[in-house]
Amino acid sequence: MAYTPANGELCKRWKKRAAHMKNERTSYETHWQELQDHFAPRSGRWIRGDRYSAGERGRKRNHKIINGTPLLSVNTLAAGMTSGNTSPARPWFRLTTPDPQLAEIGAVKQWLYAVEARMREVFSKSNLYRVLPTIYRDIGVYGTACMVELEDDDDVVRFEQFEIGSYWLAQSNRKRIDTLYREFQLTVRQIVQEFGVDACSERVKNMAKNGQWETWIDVCHAIAPNDERYIDGERWDMPVRSMYWEASGNEDKMLAVRGFESSPLLGCRWTTSGEEVYGSSPCMDALGDAKALQLKELRKAEAIDKVVNPPLIAPTSLRNQRVSMLPGDITYVDSQQSQAGLKPIHDWRPDLNAIGEDIMRSEELIRRALYVDLFLMMQNDTRSNITAREIQERHEEKLLMLGPVVERVNDELLDPIIDRTFDILVRKSRPYWEGLLNGEPLIPPPPEELAEVDLKVEFISVLAQAQKAVGLSAMDNLFGFAASLAQMNPGVLDKLDFDQAIDERADMLGVSPRIVVPDDKVAEMREAKAQQAQQAQAMQQGMAMAEMVGKAGGVKVDQTTALGRALDVAGAGPVGV
């Protein structure tokens, strides 16, 4: 049977499944809250417990932060990953085909470029670039981040990011996150607007009836593959199911059961071990240093306080007397007791320089763990004689350190974003292609060459290209070696395919396909040039023949002969008497 919002069986099953998912995450929560306290105090939503509930969302949270290096390092990591991997200022992905020869066809190349341009426009218009920094922050701090990509009538797509602590995840047999359960809060008014008053529990109905519109209600939401899918045209029988219900309601009743043609769930981890659902992060590695840093900073402040405002000793005669420590003030004592004034209890002079150096070492360890030295490499290098080549090599070498996480982010986050966005664009454009609707489609119809062809995504961001820099260096070395050999034997250049070298280098550099001429057009251009060269050669030969004939005297030339045709091409006309 197909589950409907009315039968309640689906709600019971998901309440039971949610309990198992909560049990899986329990062991991570204490660790996450420590990471939150030391690296990202304003992140996290622990709304169902006593920690940062709805009434305390605006209160101060950075009470454990004395030295801000961990927070600044997290901000640098998030900004560096955003600008290095998904910068809105430059293309960071490219669509191509599995067959390189197919991608070189002019019509295919132009269509792929048009779709890329449309997708970049959609991403810029949506809130993607406002959400991604938070995603990078979460995987850097907690090792796990999650959001959904939803269709939008105004912006084509929009993204909603979920804070750590508010959701629970499960993964498929392929170790990919495909199930989300989360808890959040809506006011009574928002619930009625979103789901309708008839779908609400009796408790919410009574609140709405009594005008308690701004009362907060805990709501549960789940997104998962539809394992009981039956194709009968109903929304809850789509490949992916989305379900809402009230967390505190005693009724086994869904607020709504909706569906998606493709999964909107986007779960990403920094790195994982074995069958773990939740990931590990660089902040987990730096947590000990962050705790030590705050303790050292506290002890340094205490030491400075003891030097500037030390504990004092005083004679007993001053016990009940007025004593002032204010600048310029006077404390009266007898002349016989003038040597028995206030004095520090001990002459202690802490080595503040050594303490400061130790703090700097802890700060440096945190920055290195969070790749701050990588993202701020040029800022930290104060040498004036560094060469451009050295800058490039050092930049590429350091960026290689992010290779594993870049590959994982591309695989778990960016690739699904591009796939789902492309599916949405195709679905919205198809009625215009088929003439069912009038107007311009979001993307043009694909050329015939791409029928039944699955497209491939290539990432060309700064971080992705750093992984390909080894190929560029190898190509440069090969051509440099061939050039040196060609001075002794020019025939060695026949071993190199210069056209293919241009194409591959352009791909590695992420050059726009409009700059590189497709192979079929290059062949046409070369054929036209060859024909022009043949015609020019024939004209030269004809003119030379005409000159020879003129010198020889009146010789009649048959126009059907090769000489006659050459003279005709050259414009010499018939020659003879």
For the regions a language model picked out, list residue spans one by one:
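Structured, contiguous alpha/beta core segments that scaffold functional sites
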Residues: 4-7, 11-13, 19, 150-327
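Generic hydrophobic, helix-prone segments enriched in Leu/Val/Ile
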Residues: 32, 77-82, 131-139, 219, ...
